[in-house]
Amino acid sequence: MDPLDFAIYRSLSPGGEARFWAGRRLIDPRIPAREIAERVGVSENGVRVRLQGLTRQGFLRGRSVIPNPSLFGVGVFVAELPVHEAGEVAQIYRDLALVEGVVFARDTLDEGERQLQVHFVSENASTAARRGALLRRLSPAGKVTPPRPYWIPACELEPSPLDWRVLHAVSLHPDASIAETARTVGISLKTGARRYHQLLETRACWWTHGPDAEEFPLALIRLGLRDPADRESVARQILDDGLAWMPVANDGYGVEPVAEPGEVAGLVPADSPTVLERAVRKFGELPGVVRVHRTFALGSMSYPEWFADRIAEHVPARH
């Protein structure tokens, strides 16, 4: 992945910041090639060619719409299962489909320790604990970390019956245009566009990669700070040094934002170990940085059934 691919891929993130809400990273497919071209300094045609290349490689294969779990009165929890053999992952992926509430799993290498991060929804901590016990039974090692809450901003909208119908249509056909969605729901284009944009603006749902998309070769870098007050200066130094860096938003990785977070997080290219290690050394040398933590994404699996069933419960069947 060259710097231009990385810059274009970053431009698909709302505000240029990465967010991981209940699984894959958020993207904004509405961003026109013209706007991306202005950001990265190439022609519109050049952007389209690069996007087509990323699609052929599988990184932008399909799109999905994920509803906000708060719409259904549930929160997201995450637990990690240790992985000792690469062959264990495929079986765990299959078994997770049998666990109620599992919505996403990511195979990661976290500072040399391989583990499967399992995201699932739950009404409360006691239900989360029971699902954690089920996950332990699926673990080849018989181990799982205690489920912990994974913070996501709540939806700001109380959906109307029409909102549910629009959300249902968009979820079933994420590649459809707004006009096609409006026809499916049986409303005007103007009403369809207004409802569609309102759902996104109030965080009732968001766009992400399709379930069959390949994991982009990125590493999550978390920089521990000596003093939270150093956060802005460290972030500025990263930009001044010209390091390839996609900042993770404060509300983007499962931790409720605080006024002065004690770390800076970002995504960096990980397809070249040599380049990555060079970047890690530079991060560690930044004034105010006391720790560099790396997490690599090796693969993932989506489980959309739970969300699909909950949305369908709010949409009367047509006869």
Model-derived segments and spans:
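A compositional/biophysical signature of low hydrophobicity enriched in polar/charged and small residues
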Residues: 1-319
